[in-house]
Swiss-Prot record:
Chain residue numbers at which the record places covalent cross-link Glycyl lysine isopeptide (Lys-Gly) (interchain with G-Cter in SUMO2): 9, 114, 142, 237, 254, 273
PANTHER family tied to this protein: MYB/SANT-LIKE DNA-BINDING DOMAIN-CONTAINING PROTEIN 4, MYB_SANT-LIKE DNA-BINDING DOMAIN-CONTAINING PROTEIN 4
Protein name: Myb/SANT-like DNA-binding domain-containing protein 4
Domain of life: Eukaryota
Alphabetized InterPro entries for the sequence: MSANTD4 (IPR026162), Myb_DNA-bind_5 (IPR028002)
Record-listed Phosphothreonine modification sites: 188
Annotated positions of the Phosphoserine modification: 106
Alphabetically ordered keywords of this record: Coiled coil, Isopeptide bond, Phosphoprotein, Ubl conjugation
Gene: MSANTD4
Species of origin: Bos taurus
Pfam families: Myb_DNA-bind_5 (PF13873)
Domain Myb-like: 4-77
An annotated GO cellular component: nucleus
Amino acid sequence: MKQLKRKRKSNFSVQETQTLLKEITKRKEVIFSKQLNTTINVMKRMAWEEIAQCVNAVGEGEQRTGTEVKRRYLDWRALMKRKKMKANIKLVGSGFPLPTSDLDDSLTEEIDEKIGFRSDTNFDWQNVADFRDAGGSLTEVKVEEEERDPQSPEFEIEEEEEMLSSVIPDSRRENELPDFPHIDEFFTLNSTPSRSAYDEPHLLVNIEKQKLELEKRRLDIEAERLQVEKERLQIEKERLRHLDMEHERLQLEKERLQIEREKLRLQIVNSEKPSLESELGQGEKSIHQPQDIETEKLKLERERLQLEKDRLQFLKFESEKLQIEKERLQVEKERLRIQKEGHLQ
């Protein structure tokens, strides 16, 4: 397989590492935030990109990305932990070794809480000359003939220790200096809980209260709607009762007209029977009977028309009443809709 020549970026210089740690200190609240959500993650990525821009502004010739400066910081932190562990082992001695768990706990606590600088503006770099002598080729662009990814973040242990030794005291000066210079961002994270951690329960309580209030309003609106529906059903029931009464009245009127018709028919039949009376009497009777029958017919017809007129007037009245009720229900429905929209807002 053809060997590909890939360029690897040069190692971080002293100035780049100094700038990196300074910028991390300025953005410690964002970078070391314990909150886990999309907004915080985006802010962290933006912070690392800003740190990378500040590192690139040093002008060492390399363009670092946010991922690279983050990896550089993690390597620096890991090296400090290893050096602290070695120092503790030397102090304790081989005859009285500390338990591994105690070493890990004390080391993690001190690194996380106390790693840092004495001042944001005055840094005490102890080993810059030695760093330049030991790592003189760090600014050179290295070319490797290999097949792996050129952006691989792994460094060899020896190279890493050489590269990072400039930012911490060496073993020859451990007796003259404190254990470590301190970074402010770590101890504030572990010793003082985030203010938002106290605000979150109150926020959840307020949200639950709002939910309960909205649910209560919804139930009130639902109760009003049911009351309106109940009234509408009552009105509908009353209307049906009136219609039943009207139906019965019309049925009685129909029976009455049937009886009148039968009565007229009997009168006609009786008028056609032969009479033994005199011709004069028959003539007078024949004159008066048709007149009486016609009069009765007209009278019955007039009464029927009057009843029909009354019925139509009653139906018209019922129709107007139903129309008014329909409009009232429409207005009530619109009022409930407006009230519901106001509650939701």
